[in-house]
Amino acid sequence: MNNLIMLVTNAVTLSEAAGGLFDFNATLPLQALQFILLTVLLTFIFYKPIGKLLEERETFISNNLAEASAKLLKADELCEQYETQLKEAKTGAQDVIAKAESEAKGIVAQEITQARADAASLIAQTNKELEAQKKLALQQLETQIDELSQLIKEKLLGKVVL
């Protein structure tokens, strides 16, 4: 290792002495070796860990996106199911309401029919009572007329007439 450092320092001093930017002497292969060594070191120390991190992050993001899209699909399915159930519930409720309305109309019609029948029987009974009272009143009037005519006869004739 010390030999390598000495070679590098010697090469640097030689290149300074020559004064050229690219001297094609021993420094060029040394610089190429340094570049390759730097590239290998950076690859293992820097690029591979960062590449792993980027790959892990990309995997994490893609997994989260896949999971989110799966959950979104499931949510859409649940939403469709709930909408279907809601439509069925509304239809069922409308059926129940229609049935209740028809039952209520039937009950009202039955009550009206019953009330009319009760009213008709009450009218018939009242008519019978009125007829009975009329007959009674006529009988009482006839009795009173007979009594009055008897009184008139007695007053006119002066005695009791049978």
From Swiss-Prot:
It is found in: Plastid, Chloroplast thylakoid membrane. The keyword DNA-binding does not apply. Disulfide bonds: none annotated. CDD domains: ATP-synt_Fo_b (cd06503). GO terms for molecular function: proton-transporting ATP synthase activity, rotational mechanism; proton-transporting ATPase activity, rotational mechanism. The chain crosses the membrane at residues 26-46. Keywords: ATP synthesis, CF(0), Chloroplast, Hydrogen ion transport, Ion transport, Membrane, Plastid, Thylakoid, Transmembrane, Transmembrane helix, Transport. It is a single-pass membrane protein. GO terms for cellular component: chloroplast thylakoid membrane; proton-transporting ATP synthase complex. It holds the Pfam family ATP-synt_B. F(1)F(0) ATP synthase produces ATP from ADP in the presence of a proton or sodium gradient. F-type ATPases consist of two structural domains, F(1) containing the extramembraneous catalytic core and F(0) containing the membrane proton channel, linked together by a central stalk and a peripheral stalk. During catalysis, ATP synthesis in the catalytic domain of F(1) is coupled via a rotary mechanism of the central stalk subunits to proton translocation. Component of the F(0) channel, it forms part of the peripheral stalk, linking F(1) to F(0). The b'-subunit is a diverged and duplicated form of b found in plants and photosynthetic bacteria. Belongs to the ATPase B chain family. F-type ATPases have 2 components, F(1) - the catalytic core - and F(0) - the membrane proton channel. F(1) has five subunits: alpha(3), beta(3), gamma(1), delta(1), epsilon(1). F(0) has four main subunits: a(1), b(1), b'(1) and c(10-14). The alpha and beta chains form an alternating ring which encloses part of the gamma chain. F(1) is attached to F(0) by a central stalk formed by the gamma and epsilon chains, while a peripheral stalk is formed by the delta, b and b' chains. HAMAP family: ATP_synth_b_bprime (MF_01398), ATP_synth_bprime (MF_01399). In plastids the F-type ATPase is also known as CF(1)CF(0). This is ATP synthase subunit b', chloroplastic. It comes from Emiliania huxleyi (Coccolithophore).
